[in-house]
């Protein structure tokens, strides 16, 4: 556990250092005098690290968290907490973790593995016993951090988000803004010089809402029991093992401290596996070692003694050891500029009190100024100009374009650069983190941002060791920071086989990706400002600057194949969001227009120089979190989404409509009924969009009819707003499928938050909150009633006819334009060999009204007839499916041969990647295949193209003749809700089977030309940068109209 085990060590082995306190008494002790007539001084200001306190802010470990979250119960708890703090003269400031923290990626990988195992234990427990799991298996419901953040904003509790290094920013923010104490639960905070450190896990609010208690850690007592000077805590923390120098690299040193005669020495190497000593034993041994160090400034001598048993990568370990010490010393440095707006409590002489680093127990009831304070000199320090304070209390939704960024471009080196005086540089341990030092990922070329280098120079001038911390790299194929170390390790003298205690410990690998497109400085300034204020989805800023995103673990049964993983289910949403963030549609349209004018290549065959690739870190079935997935950004094909600057900052009515249309298009819900308040109320729009998206998923049944009704019935139930009655509601037997459906739904809500913020917040955040439409426990009760008792819709609505009518209207709006029919007979012929590598269309282009098919098809028995306006999907001259056509006049030409795929007939798809051209380019063994290119060379950056338009026309003519003779068609049908045959394998989850089809007959919600955004990820993935359908004159006229 390394340094992270120090927190538990204090509680178990230093009982005198853990003192229970009541925060209201501490607040009363900070008042001036004791008379009632005197006004109180400034309130007791506490900074709360939300990452360690989410379960307490959620309301505790009550048993119904597994059902997807009881958000009204959480809202009531936070309301009581806010009321108690206001009555007790306590001011809370909650700091959320919004940093990507590539330097702690290996810790995140371990945590994801543990949570994934916990999720399987939860599912197994529910399947076997049907009861809620024990609280030790608490797994935060999806979207819990965002919901807590929005609830705190509702109760006017200030919030903020970190942006680079969460721990350092929390410590710096706590000191520079005059907080009396920190409420957290992390060893990094315990080992830094924080005067008042309270336990987040012990934070409790009494039932009457009048007493708020917790525990305080007295670090001077801890130092006394360890017999260690607090000034040596940085070396102590570095030798325990941390995110810079993990305890696996220090295993040989820890075992050497114990000695061969120690009772645990026999466990040093067991079964050829690395075994670490117990944490409490290591802490005592390292404390004894640090106590006996003669000169704590001679780091070279200390490192030489520590790594004398190391057999490989010694120089790298020494470098990391020095960076770890610099990291913890930076957290213990005193304030360079005290906060001008905060004054400590003056003593009778008028002099502001100074607090020692570790207060004595006599100071518990009356906390003095917690930081060293001096009277104001009339000016503000640099740290105050760019901090998280002065957040307006926004009781109602304020449009994004009205929330201008206070950051002055002239003061900041770059709109995307964070002031180095405020944000200490984060130490990275992953390969290629902060390699370029420009605020973006080292894996992206960022030469188009010259102002970032300017800010970096000022950072180097202010802090000498910042450059060393910012270049802390992990050996990897893509990183270049450790070339010298790797070269030295590969010399003949270092070619011996290392022992287990000196093997490399990084269990993740980064991948180099193409450079990100340039983003407007105004957009970056707004994104940074809103990110730090906690007003935006945290990963939007990191996608814009670093091109990376993390996806949390959800409760899903990895053995059962009935439901897809949430990361795969909502990946198309994220792909379209990435396209919106980087203004992909407008950029591509301009490039196509330019290429067409220069007569270089027809627009149908235009391919950009490089695609926009986002790295997604996720862990689910068949995917390890150790490597990222390369996901390509997609653009809407049927309409040109405006650029991000106009989408965010535009004030015209048309801009507002475009925001809403972009959001609906990302959620595949661009239908007129979604904007009809009579059918879909505003506060239920997110609910209906997520349910419609789940219904459209091809290949695997996600929502049945009765399950859809259960979701809608609980959303309009009066019991939703009665958390006390829901607590008394008893559920006899939990259903594992219901638990997984709740997790999938909340994952969809999380993606809806992402899409809404990325599109400029067309839906006010007050109407996005899940307590307006979801309660996990109520949903499980409705699901049991609908599936087990076979209750009718009127019974699900508790006999209220008006509620049943609302459910009917919402269901019709959700299913508008979606036509599903059941397959009666199997396909007459098996799919062609190329099918697994050419995913068929599962989300066809929407079209105008179309009557349901009747009678028998003309081709084969049991196959639904093709509509008169329909078309065929032909790949490599073979018909692999039929799909609903568009308006009259659109051509039905087949896909050109430049559609590419991966591998050969005997090659599988690269592990952990999706079916996009760029992933096939960067994936292992990826090759492009096309007619006329039999002798294919190594993987290319682009698919091959015909040399002339004549050859293309000749190829298309040949394919059209071949397609008429090859009559292999799909069934054109779906099971009950977009399902193919239930026996379909899980490998066909993404639509590779070609057996599921859905037709849409809806119009666009905000467009009169009936042009709906394409909802087919595979068509976009295969053709976004290669080829497109040839457009007829009518289509060209519409395109000219848009231009």
Swiss-Prot record:
Ranges of compositional bias, category Basic and acidic residues: 451-471, 951-964
Membrane topology: Peripheral membrane protein
GO MF entry, a single one: RNA binding
GO-annotated cellular components: cytoplasm; plasma membrane
Compositionally biased intervals (Low complexity): 995-1010
Main location: cytoplasm
Family, similarity comment: Belongs to the constitutive coactivator of PPAR-gamma family.
Name of this chain's protein: Constitutive coactivator of PPAR-gamma-like protein 1 homolog
């Amino acid at each position: 556990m390394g340094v992270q085990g120090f927190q538990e060590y204090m509680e178990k082995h230093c009982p005198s250092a853990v003192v229970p306190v009541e925060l209201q008494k501490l607040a009363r002790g900070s008042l001036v005098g004791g008379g009632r007539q005197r006004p109180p001084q400034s309130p007791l200001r506490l900074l709360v690290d939300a990452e360690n306190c989410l379960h307490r802010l959620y309301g505790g470990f009550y048993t119904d968290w597994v059902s997807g979250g009881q958000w009204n119960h959480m809202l009531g708890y936070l309301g009581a907490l806010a009321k108690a703090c206001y009555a007790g003269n306590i001011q809370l400031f909650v700091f959320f973790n919004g940093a990507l923290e590539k330097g702690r990626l290996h810790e995140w990988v371990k945590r994801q593995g543990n949570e994934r195992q916990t999720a399987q234990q939860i599912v197994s427990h529910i399947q076997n016993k049907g009861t809620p799991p024990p609280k030790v298996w608490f797994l935060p419901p999806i979207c819990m951090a965002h919901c807590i953040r929005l609830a705190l904003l509702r109760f006017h509790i200030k919030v903020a988000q970190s942006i680079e290094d969460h721990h350092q920013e929390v410590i710096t923010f706590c000191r520079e803004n005059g907080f009396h104490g920190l409420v957290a639960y992390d060893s990094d905070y315990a080992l830094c010089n924080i005067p008042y450190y309270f336990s987040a896990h012990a934070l409790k609010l009494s039932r009457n809402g009048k007493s708020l208690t917790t525990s305080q850690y007295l670090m001077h007592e801890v130092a006394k029991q360890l017999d260690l000077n607090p000034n040596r805590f940085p070396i102590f923390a570095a030798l325990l093992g941390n995110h810079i120098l993990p305890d696996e690299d220090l295993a040989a040193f820890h075992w050497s401290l114990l000695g061969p005669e120690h009772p645990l020495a026999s466990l040093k190497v067991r079964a050829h596996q690395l075994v670490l000593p117990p944490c409490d034993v290591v802490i005592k041994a390292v404390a004894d070692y640090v106590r006996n160090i003669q000169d704590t400034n001679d780091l070279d001598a200390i490192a030489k003694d520590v790594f004398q048993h190391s057999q490989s990568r010694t120089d790298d370990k020494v470098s990391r050891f020095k960076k770890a010490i610099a990291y913890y010393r930076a957290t213990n440095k005193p304030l360079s500029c005290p906060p001008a707006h905060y004054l400590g409590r003056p003593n009778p002489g008028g002099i502001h009190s100074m607090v020692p680093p570790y207060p004595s127990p006599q100071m518990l009831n009356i906390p003095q100024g917690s930081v060293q304070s001096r009277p104001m000199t009339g000016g503000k320090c640099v740290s105050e100009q760019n901090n998280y304070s002065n957040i307006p209390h926004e009781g109602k939704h304020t449009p994004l374009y009205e929330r201008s960024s206070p950051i002055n471009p002239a003061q900041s080196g770059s709109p995307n650069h964070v002031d180095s005086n405020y944000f200490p540089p984060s130490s990275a341990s992953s390969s290629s983190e902060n390699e370029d030092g420009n605020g973006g990922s080292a894996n992206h070329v960022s030469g188009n941002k010259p102002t970032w280098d300017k800010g970096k120079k000022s950072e180097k001038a202010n802090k000498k060791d910042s450059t060393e911390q910012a270049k802390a790299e992990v050996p990897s194929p893509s990183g270049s920071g450790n070339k010298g170390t790797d070269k030295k390790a590969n010399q003949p003298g270092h070619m011996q086989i290392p022992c287990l205690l000196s093997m490399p410990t990084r269990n993740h690998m980064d991948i180099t990706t193409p450079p990100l497109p340039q983003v407007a400085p105004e957009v970056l300034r707004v994104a940074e400002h809103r990110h730090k204020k906690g007003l935006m989805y945290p990963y939007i800023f990191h996608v814009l600057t670093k091109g990376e995103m993390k996806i949390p673990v959800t409760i899903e049964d990895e053995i059962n194949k009935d439901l897809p993983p949430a990361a795969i289910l909502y990946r198309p949403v994220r792909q379209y969001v990435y396209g919106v963030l980087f203004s992909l549609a407008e950029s591509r349209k301009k490039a196509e227009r330019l290429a067409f004018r220069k007569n270089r290549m027809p627009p149908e065959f235009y391919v950009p120089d490089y695609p926009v690739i986002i790295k997604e870190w996720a862990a689910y079935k068949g995917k390890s979190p150790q490597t990222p997935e390369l996901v390509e950004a997609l653009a809407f094909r049927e309409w040109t989404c405006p650029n991000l600057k106009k989408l965010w900052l535009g004030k015209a009515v048309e801009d507002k409509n475009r925001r809403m249309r972009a959001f609906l298009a990302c959620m595949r819900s661009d239908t007129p009924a979604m904007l009809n308040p009579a059918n879909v109320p505003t506060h239920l729009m997110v609910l209906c969009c997520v349910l419609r998206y789940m219904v459209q998923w091809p290949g695997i049944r996600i929502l049945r009819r009765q399950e859809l009704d259960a979701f809608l019935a609980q959303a309009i139930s009066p019991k939703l707003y009665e958390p006390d009655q829901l607590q008394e509601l008893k559920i006899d037997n939990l259903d594992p499928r219901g638990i997984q459906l709740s997790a999938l739904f909340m994952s969809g809500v999380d993606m809806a938050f992402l899409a809404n913020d990325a599109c400029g917040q067309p839906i006010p955040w007050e109407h996005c909150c899940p307590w307006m439409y979801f309660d996990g426990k109520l949903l499980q009760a409705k699901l049991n009633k609908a599936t087990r008792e076979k209750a009718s819709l009127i019974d699900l609505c508790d006999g209220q006819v008006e509620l049943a009518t609302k459910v009917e209207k919402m269901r019709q709006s959700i299913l508008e334009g979606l036509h599903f029919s059941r397959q009666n007979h199997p396909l007459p012929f098996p799919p062609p060999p190329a099918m697994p590598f050419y995913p068929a269309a599962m989300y066809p282009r929407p079209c105008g009204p179309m009557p349901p098919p009747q009678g028998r098809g003309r081709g084969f028995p049991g196959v639904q007839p093709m509509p008169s306006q329909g078309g065929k999907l032909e790949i490599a001259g073979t018909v692999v499916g039929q799909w609903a056509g568009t308006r009259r006049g659109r051509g039905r030409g087949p896909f050109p041969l430049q559609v590419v795929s991966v591998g050969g007939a005997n090659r599988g798809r690269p592990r952990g990647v999706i079916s996009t051209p760029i992933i096939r380019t960067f994936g292992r063994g990826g090759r492009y295949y096309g007619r006329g290119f039999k002798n294919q060379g190594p993987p290319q950056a682009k698919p091959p193209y015909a040399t002339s338009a004549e050859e293309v026309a000749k190829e298309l003519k040949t394919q059209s003749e071949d397609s008429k003779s090859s009559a292999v068609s799909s069934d054109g049908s779906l099971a009950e809700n977009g399902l193919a045959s239930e026996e379909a394998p899980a490998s066909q989850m993404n639509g590779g089977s070609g057996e599921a089809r859905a037709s849409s007959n809806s119009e666009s919600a905000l467009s009169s030309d009936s042009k709906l955004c394409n909802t087919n990820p595979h068509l976009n993935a295969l053709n976004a940068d290669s080829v497109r359908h040839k457009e007829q004159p009518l289509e060209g006229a519409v395109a000219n109209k848009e231009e």
